[in-house]
Amino acid sequence: MSWKYVPLLILILTAFAGAAGCLSTTFQEVTYGDDGLEISVENSGKPVEKAVLQVTIMKVEGFKQSEVYRKAQYVDLDSGRNAYTIPVDLEPGSYKLFLIVLVGDERKASVIRDLEVAP
């Protein structure tokens, strides 16, 4: 291997090492039931007090989306799996869920999920 590629290799390895810490919080299973929306969040990092969980629900009808719910609330993220219940009543139909976890000014996790509510 030529020595001229060593700095590039070091830069790439440094980028991967830095990005590894960004995946400490992830969304897991999201379901809808009688109690509302059940959201599971996995935190593989240290516990965090007063993280913000933001939930936006859009009803999808054809090519049109309309917002039916939006709320941000403070949550405590313990290490491991965390479960949160969002009390919301949804009519049967198709929805898109936009879920975000913020710690301070930093977005720790975000995901868009499809949800079908049966009649």
Listing of model-derived features with the role each one plays in the protein:
Residues 1-26, 39:
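Secretory targeting signatures
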Residues 61-65, 79, 93:
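Amphipathic, non-transmembrane alpha-helical stretches in extra-cytosolic proteins
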Residues 87-90:
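Short, flexible loop/turn segments at beta-strand junctions in immunoglobulin-like
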Residues 21-74, 98-102, 106-119:
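Primarily secretory-pathway and cell-envelope proteins
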Residues 82, 93-99:
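A short tyrosine-centered beta-strand micro-motif
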Residues 77-85:
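Aromatic sugar-binding surface patches on proteins
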